[in-house]
């Protein structure tokens, strides 16, 4: 029991130590310099996301398996729809698509006061939709986002359930947002499944 508990403590200390300095620097840089905030955000996405899984694997025996062989069969650019199971899903995609520019559709609350995450989402221009936006407003956000990601050769990622599942089962698929993003980006669609 002590060994299991101690490994959790060590993992938390490592994770906290890893994210604290970049998070604080990005909070300071965001209002002052977009260029520096972009550099810090890129570091968080490209360096810290893979390290997160290394720490979890080392101390908690958490393993990530992705079908990397399937990437060679995909077109150069596409959009992704996926189920949404946990708070690690975004980091999973960052790890799997290491080196590619990916952008998420998220609720705007994540763009405010969430350490490490908020400045990255705002600086990299992810699609932050107000929770209480009218349907037409939400569709407008998605249309602009789809066009922007296609022009910048970025991979837009949408969780059409709209939120994380509470029990591991796939939730209701909201197709209107998917259709608008697909139409505005003009990109082929890749369906991903997250499990575990």
Put a short name on every predicted segment.
Residues 1-78, 91-92:
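Membrane-anchoring hydrophobic helices of lipid-metabolizing enzymes
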Residues 61-196:
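Soluble catalytic domains of membrane acyltransferases
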